[in-house]
Structures are given as C-alpha cells and as structure tokens.
C-alpha cells in the first residue's frame, strides 16, 4: 500500500490533523531575515514535534537584546519567560495539542521587535524529556566523588562484570596493548609549528601530521588511564601517570596550542581532564594542582570560542568546530566542577546549551544535514561527554528524542552492509569498520529500536575500542520494528531514502538530497542530487575526494555541483558553495511497496542563475529508477546532466550502460533536442592523503542553447531491454518502453 507524506502539512514525524490546518508559508520577520548562518528556528512553523516540552531556538537579533518568549495553547493559556539567550528549555512537559509561540526582542534602547507567530503540534504520546535546573545538575556533579566520568557502585560492578564476560575479548586486546606499551616512554613534544609555514599546503601537512600523532597518543593515554582505573596494578598506574604528566608538560603556547592546532589542544584538554578524574585518588595534591592549572590553560581558548563573551555558538550553532568545542567544554566542566575555579561557570554556560542544541543539523526527525561522515565523528567526539553527564548528574541525553530519531536516520541512510556514507565531506571514504564502531557505541547509549537493529547487523569494528568497552551495560534487541517502512523522508534536512527492501543486504537504494541547510560547512552544492546503490556497491555516486577542508580540490571541484549527480549549465556552472542560503527542499514524497518517488526544488541553490530547478525521482521497485528534470532560465543555456561512476560510462546510440564490479545498470538519458556526451576521469586532489583513484565523470549536454530543459534519465538495474530504452512524450508525462515492459510517468 502506498503511503504519502503531505508536505503541505510539513509533518516531520507522525501525521497530525491539527498540523494540516496550519498555514505553512514561512513567516517573514526578524527571525527569518537575521542573516545566515543562524541558529535554526525551533519548533519549525507547522511542525509536529517529537519531544515534550519541545526545545525552543531562534536567531539572535543583536547581542545585548533581552527576549520574551511566549507560548500560547489552543485554549488561550499562555506561559512566558524573559531571557538574554536565544533558546529555552521549559522545566515541565506540555500537554498534547496545538500551540502558538512568538518572541519579543527588546533592545537596549527600549525598542521592542515582535516576531510573527509560529504554530506547532504536540501529538498524544509524545516522549517526555525534561531537563532539571542547571543549578541542580551542577550541585549533583560537585557532590559526585571522583571518578565522575565512570560508573560507580552497582553500575561499576556491572561494567567490571561485562569486561570479564561478553566484552572480555575486546578488553583482553586492550590490556595486551597496554602491556606492550609499559616500557615505551612518553611521546616527544612536537617542535614544528604550522604557524611558521609560509605555504598553505605545507601548513596543512604539519597540521595533519600533528593531528595524526595526537590521535594515536590520545588513544594510548586514555587506554592506560582506563586500565589503571579498573585494575589494581602499580605498573599500570605508574605508566598512566607518566603518560598524563608528560602531556601536561607540553607548552600550551607552542605547536600544540589552540592557535597552532586547535584539534591537538582540544584533545589535550580532554585527556588531561579525564586523566585527572579517572585517577583522582591516585594523584598527589601537587599533581592535582598542576593538572588543573594545565587543564585551565588548554580549555580557556576553547571556552572563548564556544560560550565566551561573544556567545558564538548561540549566534552560529551551525559551526562544526564550535559544536565539538561546546561538547568538550561541557564534558570538562562536569569532570572538574568544584575543583577548577572557573569550571562551575563553564558548566552553567555549556551544559544546558549543549543539551538544547546537541547536534543542530536537523529537526526532530533526527536528520543530520552535515553529512553522514561527520555524523559518525559527532558520535566519536560525544560518547565520553554523554557518559560523563549521565554518570555525574543523571542527565541521560540518550533518552532525548532527537537522538532516538537520529538512530532511525542511520538505519535508513547507512543500512546493513553499507561501506560508505552519503552527502558531504568524506562521504566517499570506504570505512565500514568506523561506521560499525560508532553505530554500536551509540546503540549502547540511545534507546532506539532502529539503531539496535542496525547495530546487530554491523560488523568489522574494533571490539577493543573504548567507546564500546565503557558503554553502559544495556540489553540491545536487534529486531527491526514491525512498523518500519522501506522508505523515509527527513524534511528538516531534505534527505530521502527509497529501498527495494530495507532489511535485505542485496537491496537497491536510491538516496536523494535537497537540503534547506544548503552547502554550508561540510555540505556540498548538491541540492536535487542523488546517489544509487546496488547492495553495498555505489553504482552512481558523488565525485571527488576529501583531502582537507578548504583545499583547492575541495573548493574547485569536490564541493561543486558538477561533482555530483545533478544539473549544471554552460561548462559546469551550478549552485553556490559554502552558502546556507543556496538551499533546496523536498516538496513531495511518496513511499510504497512497488513505487516510491521524491520531488525536490533547488531553485534557490543556483542563486538567481535559474528560474526553476525541479527534479522528481521515481523508483519502480525493485530495480528501475527514472529521474525527471525541469530547468528554466531567463538566459539561453547549454544544460548538463552529470553522472558519476567508478568505471567508465558507455554511451552508444543514445543508450547508457554503467557498472561497478558486479553491479550494472542500463538505460538512457533523454531530451527532445538530443544530447552530446563526453566523459573524463575526475581531477585528483594534490594531497596524497586522499582516497583511491578518480571516478569517471559523464556529462550529457544539450546540443543548443535553450531557456528550458525537460529531461528523463532511465537506469534499469535488471537491464531488461536488451540494450534498447525508448522514451516518448505523451499528452501528459512520458511513456517509457524497456524491452517488453512499459511504464507511464505522470
């Protein structure tokens, strides 16, 4: 049976008749015109929220303003709060129903700026997530004896038990590494400073080498600290002390400084804070003082970049580096509150904001617009913060509905058997072991049946990784929910997944993106683009390679529209990069057992170069995909349909063949005026640190200049036509002949 999401209702999750009555035009006011990037407005207008009470966010109008947030129920009951922050979390659940909310910004001169009213619906049965008062959380953290970041009492006993039972193979591997490391000395402090390099490429090489060294050393030191904390052995303890004090001796103004290599400085702050906490009772008073002093030096500039006087993360939450910094400040504050004089203030600033934002790259539906590669690194950076908050304060972010739905998102966009991510920087990297590691680490911390199902079928992870070994001891069921469909659209981020069969490893999967977040941060100029997988093999994929952020290859090709399965014109011109306003949106979606389709509008992404950029993808299950494009421009253009593959595309007599190993597709690319075809291997990045060889870039270009394009691309995974696919226009739509089969498109 076909199921349809009526986008006029802008339903992010469960359908709601109340939400369908909402006028969906985005209100035009100071909250919608504050400039980009900004803190996204939540709850979105006409949204059906998935958390009670919902998180409230809005853009800062101007630093120094005071805000009055007002929420009115459908029966006229109002509640309000005055705040200098542009976000708020209520301290009790909301009753199911429809609500209207607005914000009044009061500037220092006494002028008031009222926003338009926005509406949201809270369906019956919405999960409750109430955050205790910050003062209460801080008091609990301060009262908690060290080690706060590790479980205590019966929870600690249970952790020790599983390390000797079901997690014993991984624990044994970690112990073996630490045993082999006992006679190694401390790593030498780096002496080469990126700031002293005159060429950008040389600077990047030093930055990357410093991070590679620190990544290894961070793991080494934390493993030693964990073994020393859980095993009563003098040799382990002396080894952990030696490593931690060795890192503490590094010059915080040298090559490892925040100004020189912020990732290294951040990792040092984390290692020192965890080492201080986990081994607290084994440090002398002088050693504790020295460690706290060094933690303060390391964390100081991180605090300034996240929650300092300029309140950067409130102004621009869509800052990948700043978001990680915010989590680090929150985690370090939890571990050092009451010990480090400034830690209480950091706690009060960072913990509630981190709880509210978490990962602000999507809405309640669990979307993550910054790409799946960076979604995994969010988990890598956050697991110890989640553990520290839960163990020290009782605040369990694993019960936050967004994280539950984030788990559902992973199940649909990196389903079992996937080797690569989707969309954005690093999506092409083949690292199933990394995905398995962090999917399982998250599944042990987040109550999500979709995530549990995905974790049970993910394999190849390093079972000795700390994110897995110290995870909460929970029972994880590996059963896909009976209500699970084969298709999913996440409207908040403009992503859609359509599968022939979600549970099957040999599934055919069509992934589509047309994102309201545009091409900001690690996202690419790929609105209305798609990726096609056959089982684990990407048949039609995005192009380019991620060498380093902001590289010539990244800016000149990798992030560009022409490096994706999308439409360009006049020699590869396309959408704007590094621009949140260069956005798209899903305007139609329908899932089903035999047919699914998704429709996107990417007109804004081209920043005025086109008048219309429309694409609809039909998936005739299990193995036929058709992509319809409509483009228009005031200026005549040569339009280009770009396709990317691992092997050369074959185009003869207007018939297409594409393959990747055993995966194969046949079809055609059609326009009424005909197309010229050319292809070449893609440009490679200068950096040798990027991935494997180049992909093939096929360009189907209109033969003349025209103001409009109407095109249809057919990809048949069964190759049923024995080499012949015929497209004919009908009174309305198309008739497509594929061998003996006929398909009609509306």
Regions found by a protein language model. Name each.
Residues 310, 336, 374-539, 589-593, ...:
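Carbohydrate-active enzyme catalytic cores, enriched for enzymes
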Residues 108-124:
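Extracellular fibronectin type III
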